[in-house]
UniProtKB/Swiss-Prot annotation:
Role noted for this protein: This is one of the proteins that bind and probably mediate the attachment of the 5S RNA into the large ribosomal subunit, where it forms part of the central protuberance.
Quaternary state and interactors: Part of the 50S ribosomal subunit; part of the 5S rRNA/L5/L18/L25 subcomplex. Contacts the 5S and 23S rRNAs.
Protein name per Swiss-Prot or TrEMBL: Large ribosomal subunit protein uL18
Native species: Finegoldia magna (strain ATCC 29328 / DSM 20472 / WAL 2508)
Key words, A-Z: Ribonucleoprotein, Ribosomal protein, RNA-binding, rRNA-binding
Any single GO CC term annotated in Swiss-Prot or TrEMBL for this entry: cytosolic large ribosomal subunit
A GO biological-process term: translation
Recorded superkingdom: Bacteria
GO molecular function term, any single one: 5S rRNA binding
Similarity annotation: Belongs to the universal ribosomal protein uL18 family.
Disulfide bonds: none
Length: 120
Protein backbone atom coordinates (compact mmCIF):
# COMPACT_ATOMS: atom_id res chain seq x y z
CA UNK A 1 0.00 0.00 0.00
CA UNK A 2 1.25 3.46 -0.89
CA UNK A 3 1.63 6.24 1.61
CA UNK A 4 0.27 9.64 0.71
CA UNK A 5 3.06 12.19 0.40
CA UNK A 6 2.60 15.13 2.75
CA UNK A 7 4.17 18.06 0.89
CA UNK A 8 3.97 20.45 3.83
CA UNK A 9 5.71 17.99 6.18
CA UNK A 10 8.49 17.59 3.62
CA UNK A 11 8.73 21.39 3.35
CA UNK A 12 9.06 21.71 7.13
CA UNK A 13 11.86 19.11 7.14
CA UNK A 14 13.66 21.04 4.38
CA UNK A 15 13.15 24.27 6.33
CA UNK A 16 14.69 22.81 9.49
CA UNK A 17 17.67 21.51 7.49
CA UNK A 18 18.20 24.92 5.92
CA UNK A 19 17.74 26.83 9.19
CA UNK A 20 20.63 24.97 10.83
CA UNK A 21 23.01 27.01 8.68
CA UNK A 22 21.12 30.33 8.35
CA UNK A 23 21.17 33.04 10.99
CA UNK A 24 20.37 36.70 10.81
CA UNK A 25 21.97 39.54 12.73
CA UNK A 26 20.88 43.13 13.20
CA UNK A 27 23.34 44.21 10.47
CA UNK A 28 22.38 41.39 8.08
CA UNK A 29 18.94 40.03 9.06
CA UNK A 30 17.20 36.96 7.68
CA UNK A 31 14.45 37.57 5.10
CA UNK A 32 11.94 34.84 5.93
CA UNK A 33 9.08 34.00 3.55
CA UNK A 34 5.78 32.29 4.37
CA UNK A 35 2.96 31.68 1.95
CA UNK A 36 -0.53 30.43 2.62
CA UNK A 37 -3.25 29.65 0.10
CA UNK A 38 -4.56 33.21 0.24
CA UNK A 39 -1.67 35.47 1.34
CA UNK A 40 2.10 35.83 1.34
CA UNK A 41 4.20 37.16 4.22
CA UNK A 42 7.82 38.34 4.54
CA UNK A 43 9.83 39.32 7.64
CA UNK A 44 13.33 40.57 8.32
CA UNK A 45 14.37 38.78 11.51
CA UNK A 46 17.30 39.36 13.86
CA UNK A 47 18.01 35.87 15.24
CA UNK A 48 20.56 37.10 17.78
CA UNK A 49 18.07 39.32 19.65
CA UNK A 50 15.02 37.26 18.62
CA UNK A 51 12.96 40.09 17.16
CA UNK A 52 11.37 41.09 13.88
CA UNK A 53 12.87 44.24 12.39
CA UNK A 54 10.55 44.72 9.38
CA UNK A 55 7.46 42.87 8.19
CA UNK A 56 5.27 43.06 5.09
CA UNK A 57 2.41 40.99 3.73
CA UNK A 58 -0.58 41.13 1.45
CA UNK A 59 -2.65 42.03 4.52
CA UNK A 60 -0.83 45.36 5.07
CA UNK A 61 -2.63 48.65 4.55
CA UNK A 62 0.22 49.74 2.26
CA UNK A 63 -0.42 46.80 -0.09
CA UNK A 64 -2.08 47.99 -3.29
CA UNK A 65 -2.57 44.84 -5.38
CA UNK A 66 -5.95 43.49 -6.40
CA UNK A 67 -5.18 39.81 -5.90
CA UNK A 68 -3.40 38.64 -2.77
CA UNK A 69 -2.21 35.20 -3.80
CA UNK A 70 -0.54 35.45 -7.21
CA UNK A 71 2.99 36.20 -8.41
CA UNK A 72 2.28 39.90 -8.95
CA UNK A 73 1.20 40.20 -5.32
CA UNK A 74 4.39 38.44 -4.21
CA UNK A 75 6.48 40.90 -6.22
CA UNK A 76 4.62 43.84 -4.62
CA UNK A 77 5.25 42.39 -1.14
CA UNK A 78 8.94 42.04 -2.01
CA UNK A 79 9.11 45.67 -3.12
CA UNK A 80 7.22 46.74 0.01
CA UNK A 81 9.58 44.95 2.41
CA UNK A 82 12.56 46.26 0.46
CA UNK A 83 11.36 49.87 0.82
CA UNK A 84 10.66 49.41 4.53
CA UNK A 85 14.10 47.86 5.08
CA UNK A 86 15.91 50.64 3.21
CA UNK A 87 14.00 53.22 5.29
CA UNK A 88 15.27 51.49 8.45
CA UNK A 89 18.85 51.47 7.15
CA UNK A 90 19.04 47.77 6.27
CA UNK A 91 20.70 47.14 2.91
CA UNK A 92 21.81 43.49 3.14
CA UNK A 93 20.00 40.36 4.25
CA UNK A 94 20.13 36.57 4.10
CA UNK A 95 17.30 35.00 2.09
CA UNK A 96 15.40 32.20 3.86
CA UNK A 97 12.96 30.52 1.48
CA UNK A 98 11.48 28.45 4.35
CA UNK A 99 11.76 25.15 2.53
CA UNK A 100 9.80 26.35 -0.52
CA UNK A 101 11.31 25.88 -3.95
CA UNK A 102 12.93 29.01 -5.38
CA UNK A 103 10.27 29.26 -8.05
CA UNK A 104 7.04 31.14 -8.65
CA UNK A 105 5.87 33.36 -5.79
CA UNK A 106 9.05 32.94 -3.74
CA UNK A 107 11.22 33.92 -6.70
CA UNK A 108 9.02 36.94 -7.50
CA UNK A 109 9.19 38.11 -3.87
CA UNK A 110 12.98 37.86 -3.94
CA UNK A 111 13.20 39.76 -7.23
CA UNK A 112 10.87 42.46 -5.88
CA UNK A 113 13.04 42.90 -2.80
CA UNK A 114 16.17 43.09 -4.97
CA UNK A 115 14.56 45.70 -7.22
CA UNK A 116 13.77 47.81 -4.13
CA UNK A 117 17.46 47.81 -3.17
CA UNK A 118 18.01 44.86 -0.82
CA UNK A 119 21.16 42.84 -1.49
CA UNK A 120 21.31 39.07 -0.97
Amino acid sequence: MFKKIDKNANRVKRHLRIRKNLTGTSEKPRLCVFKSNTNIYAQLIDDVNHNTLVAASTLDKDFSGESKSNKEAAKLVGELIGKKAIDKGIEQCVFDRSGYLYHGKVKELAEGARSAGLKF
